[in-house]
A protein has these predicted regions:
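N- or domain-start disorder-to-order transition segments that initiate the globular core
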Residues: 25-42
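A short loop-to-beta-strand scaffold at the N-terminal edge of the catalytic core in hydrolase folds
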Residues: 43-51
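Active-site beta-strand termini and strand-to-loop segments that position acidic
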Residues: 50-54, 225
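Active-site/substrate-binding loop(s) of hydrolase catalytic cores
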Residues: 56-60, 70-204
């Protein structure tokens, strides 16, 4: 069945919203899928999994191995909702095993690492953490035909003309020579299909990650074990800091990927190389022609601002604290928001701790004008 993107609201899981997604957030939806507790985190939080489908082709999917990367978790539940309510025939060809939050401690604390401050995506060989050992155990037992590794990427990623990288993909290397092994070609072929489909929706906003080999990364390890593995990265769109727009596009990408595998819609793997590689030329805000105090006078300069993500445990929401990132000509840098301060008469003393607050006050004024 062809995906009708206008139907998104019909299968979107509206209970999930924002950036702070934990076991508690997903529990109501999860409970409808007959989940089981596959293991426990360092702090003994349950790591849930569920399965659906009776097809011979097995796909293992995990999300939030980095606890603060939650967009793909929302998209994953939207995708499952689509399959079960709109296109259940897919499950005759495939079977899904899903771990929606592999790192529940990191999700709770809104940290990349687990409770022991270990990056689970650098623990694929040593397997020092219970979460890593669980994923490997499920992989070894299931022997999947495909693996989907779901992540979020920072707002810095860009493509040509400073366009935002809203989606990124990677077929991980399986060796230092980046050889096109059979498993790697298969994952490239799936990505090529998704790229062709998604380029009709967000042309110019899809990127490809660097494929330098690191056996400590889970995707590289599974690819080296001859399992086609795909990295999905949820990127940023304009001022959508809750990542609800990106969520939708990741959902579509997951659906296209599963349809590709179920219906054998694989494209020429060489098309994978047509996806532009990600650059890191974006910031959250770029301000040009800002007057900065310099001794007894001032100078005109440019600066960039990045938001630091902070968990407010009272409201259980993520707050975005602005911080000055760079100052200078910054010709090779842009922003998701670019503002010209030439009409702002204020001279900003960047040595004062409240200078960023004054800058943001004027940012908001200019945004209201425009």
């Amino acid at each position: 069945m062809e995906l009708n993107i206008k139907d998104y609201k019909k299968f979107k899981e509206n209970d999930l919203f924002g950036r702070y997604i934990t076991n508690d957030s997903i529990y109501r939806i999860l409970s409808t899928y007959s989940p089981k507790i596959s293991g426990y985190s360092v702090q003994k939080r349950p790591i849930y999994s569920f399965s659906c489908g009776s097809g011979k082709t097995k796909i293992l999917i995990w999300s939030q191995m980095h606890g603060n990367e939650s967009t793909s978790t929302k998209a994953l539940f939207d995708c499952i909702s689509y399959i079960l309510t709109i296109d259940p025939s897919l499950l005759d060809s495939i079977s899904l095993t899903v771990l929606p939050i592999l790192n529940p401690d990191g999700a709770f604390e809104y940290t990349r690492e687990n409770y022991n401050k270990i990056d689970l995506n650098r623990d694929a060989v040593d397997l020092t953490q219970p979460e890593s050992r669980l994923l490997r155990s499920i992989y070894d037992t299931l022997k999947p035909h495909f693996c989907f590794n779901l992540h979020d990427q920072r707002t810095i990623y860009s493509l040509n003309n400073f366009d935002s990288s809203i989606l990124s993909f990677l077929s991980p290397s399986s060796d230092k020579n980046k050889l096109e092994t059979e498993s790697r070609i298969k994952s490239m072929s799936v990505i090529s299909h998704v790229y062709e489909s998604m380029s009709k929706i967000i042309p110019g906003n899809i990127g490809r990650y660097n494929d330098d080999f690191n056996i400590n990364c889970v995707g590289d390890t599974f690819q080296s074990l001859k399992t086609p593995t795909i990295l999905f990265e949820s990127g940023h769109y304009n001022d959508d800091y809750n990542r609800e727009v990106s969520r939708k596009y990741v959902c579509f990408s997951l659906i296209y990927s599963i349809q590709c595998i179920a219906n054998k819609l694989f494209k020429d793997h060489n098309n994978y190389y047509n996806i532009p590689e990600n650059k890191t030329q974006l910031t959250d805000i770029k301000i040009v022609n800002i007057k900065v105090k310099q001794k007894s006078t001032f100078k005109l300069t440019n600066l960039t601002i990045m938001f630091k993500e902070i968990l407010n445990k009272e409201t259980q929401t993520i707050e975005f604290k602005p911080e000055i990132n760079e100052i200078g000509t910054l010709l090779n840098t842009s922003g998701h928001l670019v503002l010209d301060f030439k009409i702002i008469d204020t001279i900003f003393d960047l040595t004062k701790p409240n200078s960023i607050d004054n800058i943001i006050l004027n940012v908001n004024k200019l945004r209201n004008i425009h």
